[in-house]
Regions:
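Nucleotide-sugar donor-binding patch of glycosyltransferase catalytic domains
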Residues: 277, 325-372
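Conserved catalytic-core segment of nucleotide-activated headgroup transferases in glycan assembly
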Residues: 44-54, 193-281, 355, 370, ...
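A nucleotide-sugar donor-handling region in carbohydrate enzymes
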Residues: 2-20, 142, 157-234
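C-terminal amphipathic helix plus adjacent low-complexity
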Residues: 358-410
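Active-site and donor-binding regions of nucleotide-sugar-utilizing enzymes
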Residues: 34-198
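Short acidic-hydrophobic, aromatic-tinged amphipathic segments that line or gate anion-handling sites
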Residues: 92-99, 291-296, 349-364
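Short loop/turn segments at strand-loop or loop-helix junctions that form parts
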Residues: 63-67, 117-119, 142-144, 192, ...
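A donor-sugar binding/catalytic signature common to diverse glycosyltransferases
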Residues: 140, 295-339
Length: 410
């Protein structure tokens, strides 16, 4: 769409929708809020949900629907994990799976405020997409920390007509405001939502019990091992055997968690030299080992109780710094990894140890993890202070709640 069409048609129309919806809420005395969820690891709204639920002026609902990019197996696993998660929390769920017109079913809830999991125009490819629900107060909390200089995402319909975009830092707001057709007027800086999760104690230990005290190390490989583009990360191909050998070698000193990207399994199943059977056996050996385990769900408690991490994932290169623990990024070419990153992404990565070889990984385990020789500790702490501490001395959830209250004139 042309910038002029956004400026003179879509954005003014969105503001009219917002004003009308807010007047209806004020007249009614309460707001109906719906959280649309497609993946449990991307569910960053729990503290916001809990804070709104404590105020009787908000009537909350959760609706679940899979991303179209999921394979059938991924879809079934994702939806089942969401049903189980919300059932344990006694949160009623509107299950939109299998609906031919999920947007029409969602409209039966008549949401005033609608939180989306991603800000893309054609997220689902049906009437659940944001252009079909633009008469609502659309909100978005980024599911990951923006790390690149890419501008295309900000030019989407959603980002320009949404009522609120809740960003993590002034840096992110300033960058987006230069690109958005609405000049970022709908952006509010509240801090990274992960900060709320990391500030609370672990509910229960995720790590497998050991007979003796051991260091806890996470290995989190990305799935883009066959992508030859800018985001190609192939460290799994040269570390898969090495990491298992090290898990065996350090059996008495370290316990390892294999935390693969959710899509890695399906990629390996289709990869020559791997296939479904080899992939299944590989995952199973990590799950069943005495000092190893497989984790595919939420990772905050896993991070908080760990001592270090080895990975090549984008968002983890910032999020793991909430722990303050040493972390290694595995790549043969770190210059390529940081090339397209913004200040947040670049500085987060530069606060990592770099694993370019099996020997680098071994040195990291021996010197940093086991002996505690950690020369990058101060650099990590400075990064956390610069980018990860929420503003105003409030939790992220409280800042979002207060902004919604103010925006609705409650």
């Amino acid at each position: 769409m042309e910038p002029a069409y956004f400026k003179w048609v879509l954005i003014p129309r969105a503001r009219d929708h917002h004003h009308k919806r807010i007047r209806e809420i004020q007249k009614r005395g309460y707001a109906r809020v719906v959280f649309l969820v497609s993946s449990l690891p991307m569910w960053r709204f729990q503290h916001v949900y809990d804070r709104l639920a404590a105020d009787s002026r908000f009537k909350l609902s959760v609706a679940i629907y899979p991303f179209p990019s999921f394979s059938l197996a991924e879809e079934e696993a994702s939806m089942e994990s969401l049903r189980s998660f919300f059932s344990e929390k006694a949160v009623p769920v509107l299950d939109l799976c299998g609906e031919l017109q999920p947007g029409s079913v969602l409209r039966q809830l008549d949401p005033d405020i609608l939180f989306y999991p991603q800000p893309y125009n054609h997220l689902y490819g049906n009437d659940l997409d944001s252009p079909h629900l633009a008469d609502r107060l659309l909100c978005y909390i980024p599911y990951s920390i923006y790390m690149t200089n890419a501008t295309w995402v900000y030019k989407s319909f959603f980002n320009n007509v949404a009522w609120r975009l809740y960003y993590g830092s002034q840096f992110s707001k300033a960058f987006a405001s230069r690109v958005l057709f609405n000049k970022g007027r709908n952006i509010r800086v509240v801090g990274e939502p992960m900060a709320d999760f990391f500030s609370e104690p672990s509910v229960h230990s995720i790590w497998k019990p050991q007979e003796t005290v051991k260091k806890k190390v996470i290995w989190a490989p990305h799935f883009s091992i066959v992508d030859e583009g800018l985001h190609h990360r192939d460290s799994f191909t040269w570390l898969s055997e090495t990491m298992w050998k090290m898990a065996v070698q350090y059996h008495d000193q370290i316990q390892f968690t294999f935390k693969p990207h959710p899509r890695l399994r399906s990629v390996l199943a289709d990869l020559p030299g791997w296939g479904e059977e080899k992939t299944r056996k590989y995952y199973n050996q990590w799950e069943r080992g005495d000092n190893t385990q497989l984790e595919t769900g939420p990772y905050v408690d896993l991070f908080k109780e760990s001592d270090a991490m080895i990975h090549d994932c984008g968002s983890f290169s910032v999020e793991y710094h909430f722990t303050g623990n040493p972390v290694m990024f595995t790549t043969h070419d770190m210059n390529k990894v940081v090339r397209d990153k913004n200040a947040v992404g670049k500085n987060g990565l530069l606060a990592h140890y770099v694993g370019r070889s099996e020997e680098d990984v071994r040195i990291f385990l021996d010197q940093v993890v086991l002996k505690g020789e950690d020369p990058m500790k101060q650099q990590r702490e400075q990064f956390r202070k610069d980018y990860l501490i929420p503003p105003g001395g409030k939790t992220v959830a409280e800042s979002i709640y207060m902004d919604i209250i103010q925006g609705l004139n409650f």
